[in-house]
Design a protein with these regions (language model features):
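N-terminal membrane-targeting hydrophobic helices
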Residues: 1-232, 236-241, 246, 250-253
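Extracytosolic and intramembrane catalytic regions of membrane-associated proteins
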Residues: 251-352
Length: 352
């Protein structure tokens, strides 16, 4: 999912897990929840398009990578806190230092939330790198979902002091979210806009009536996470039914060996786009493309060139086109590009 969702869910999660034991738990949760993406800066990103396809959601998002990030962040933050305590103690000042176990538990929860939230969508997750590069997809929740912004933000605001500083922060983030949601009204389902508005009204009432405050902020965060769990679980149940329907349609269309997927739709929770494929064709309900994967030039591109190999390992539904000269091959993932020669999910390979 997007980094704002990771940040807000991570903040709420670490507050729910360790707020009584770790100072600034929400702030640390923001950092920890984005550690898998931030770590990519140390392994070659940003880079070329091929670098992105290979490295994004790569080793830093694997289970091994998560263990390294959890240990590294715990040591970095824990030791930093203790150094700060030692420095301040020389001036007769004190600072609360969290216990190692609670710090590690909160950071682990936030880091692992990133992996799970990426897994629940249609982009995919590779948990077993560096040994196995297989992608896994739950196809439950879209890569961008406004409720994964709004629900944790409301909980964090409810748990804050009634002061203009935290209120201003919540209003800036909430206002930005609202701007993008309303701007995309043609993409976002009407019921989502209605529920979004209702939640905003409830958020304002809860803040002014002090339903939660600093004393109850851990409960507020836990409540928000419970709401997201129920929301995600409901989508998982509906997705299961939709997947069975799509699988049956794929087998009727292309036989028992057909591949298929139920792709999440941004802005339209509880709906999925059908995609079906055989070895020669990839199609949806109202479109169809030849894959051309057996063409000699395509085989050469995906086995002997770096860009081609990058797209081949990434694409869930790989398709290709060879230009009329036979010297250039266009490769794309039909989830995100369908016959186009431009876009982030398209790779152009020139054969020498």
């Amino acid at each position: 999912m997007d980094n704002l969702a990771h940040a807000l869910v991570g903040a709420a999660l670490m507050r729910a897990v360790a707020d009584r034991h770790v100072p600034r738990a929400a702030l640390l949760g923001i950092v920890a929840a984005n550690a898998p993406d931030l770590s990519e800066l140390f392994i070659g990103l940003p880079g070329t398009r091929a670098d992105f396809l290979v490295l994004h959601r790569g080793i830093t998002h694997s289970l091994v990578g998560a263990v390294v990030e959890i240990i590294g962040l715990t040591l970095l933050i824990g030791l930093g806190w203790r150094v700060a305590r030692w420095i301040l103690s020389r001036n007769a000042r004190t600072v609360a230092v969290p216990a190692w176990n609670w710090l590690a538990l909160g950071i682990a929860a936030a880091v692992l939330s990133h992996l799970y939230m990426d897994w629940q969508g249609s982009y995919g997750w590779r948990p077993f790198l560096p040994w196995n590069g297989t992608w896994y997809y739950l196809d439950w929740v879209a890569i961008v979902d406004p409720f994964f912004w709004l629900v944790p933000l409301v909980a964090l605001a409810w748990g804050a002091e009634r002061h203009w500083t935290p209120l201003a922060a919540a209003l800036v983030v909430g206002g930005t979210i609202t701007f993008f949601v309303t701007r995309a009204h043609d993409v976002v389902a009407t019921w989502v806009l209605v529920v979004y508005a209702i939640v905003c009204v409830v958020a304002a009432i809860g803040w002014t009536r002090y339903w939660f405050g600093p004393v109850g902020r851990q409960r507020a965060a836990a409540f928000a996470l419970l709401v997201l769990v129920v929301y995600t679980g409901a989508q998982a149940v509906v997705a299961g039914t939709r997947k069975r329907t799509i699988q049956q349609a794929a087998e009727r269309r292309f036989g028992a060996g057909a591949s298929w997927a139920a792709l999440t739709n941004v802005g339209r929770p509880f709906t999925w786009e059908s995609i079906y494929a055989s070895t020669d064709t990839v199609a949806g309900d109202d479109w169809r493309l030849a894959r051309h994967l057996r063409a000699r030039q395509v085989q050469r591109a995906i086995t002997q060139t770096r860009d081609g190999q990058a797209m081949a390992q990434f694409a869930r539904f790989l398709a290709a086109e060879v230009d009329t000269s036979g010297a250039t091959v266009y490769l794309w993932d039909a989830r995100y590009a369908r016959g186009s020669r431009d876009g982030w999910a398209v790779v152009k390979v020139r054969l020498e």
